[in-house]
Amino acid sequence: MCGVNPSYSLPNSNVFNEALKSLELSVSFSMNNTETAMLSKWVAATPHYLESWGDLEIKSGNYSLIQPTIKPLFDTKQFQDVLLNWIDSNDSYYDYLKLYWNNRIL
């Protein structure tokens, strides 16, 4: 899970929490020790959004790139970089975004 805290925000969080505890593997990517992170088997620190690459669709057909505005504060990896690593990709998330934008948006 990344960028969410369902153990806090869900109205029936007790049901979610019991299900989360029953999983063999649960990973929380978080900047803080949230309620969900505390119940997860693994917690991975994530960088602040000001340290991160990204993109978004502001409204239908209007796209924007997100560029880091500060140097990394700690030795953390962006969630998307971790996912790319897990699928044995040699690309960084920056490279992935660049390729995606060149092939599909620009």
For the regions a language model picked out, list residue spans one by one:
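Non-catalytic alpha/beta scaffold blocks inside enzyme catalytic domains
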Residues: 1-106
